Amino acid sequence: MQVSKSNKLANVCYDIRGPVLKHAKRLEEEGHRILKLNIGNPAPFGFEAPEEILQDVIRNLPTAQGYSDSKGLFSARKAIMQYYQQKQVEGIGIEDIYLGNGVSELIVMSMQALLNNGDEVLIPAPDYPLWTAAVSLAGGKPVHYLCDEQANWWPDLADIKAKITPNTKALVLINPNNPTGAV
């Protein structure tokens, strides 16, 4: 029996795992050194956790809880709330803050919680492919707006406005942008 992928992924494409990856492999075979910065794992490039962090983790292991509150650790949520209060951001309480095991988990959870079938989400292009996948899997329709290299990858406001419809449920803004790095 052959298992095929869901048709919900029909519009999902991750170029770095497609033609770009094949080209990178070919260059490696020719002897070129390729830094695969797309994998999201900084350790192979020498970016490791500071020793102080590692020691804190080791020291706290004996008292670590199996599960935290479903919204995340209270102390971390409180620190985030206090940070934004110091920045004079109003209306953020500790109950408004949710933490997860990384941005990927939070993207998927937020799209599942927010979208009904057919809802549209405006996503920057080029995009971090998980956004398109998460929207599609949640039954939504990804609609890409332009972030033009000639404009330092900033979002094109006219393009965004032109793509807003009665079905638009959300607008994704990422700062700094992934994958362009625009701030």
Predicted regions and their residues:
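N-terminal small-domain helix-loop-helix segment of the aminotransferase-like
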Residues: 3, 10-102, 109
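CheY-like receiver
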Residues: 23, 110, 159-163
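Short, solvent-exposed loop/turn segments at secondary-structure junctions
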Residues: 40-44, 128, 177-179
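Short acidic capping loops at alpha-helix termini that bridge into adjacent secondary structure
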Residues: 91-97, 117-120, 167
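Conserved PLP-anchoring active-site segment centered on the Schiff-base-forming lysine
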Residues: 113-135
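A short helix-loop-beta submotif of the ANL/AMP-binding
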Residues: 136-143
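Active-site phosphate-binding strand-loop segment of PLP-dependent enzymes
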Residues: 143, 148-183
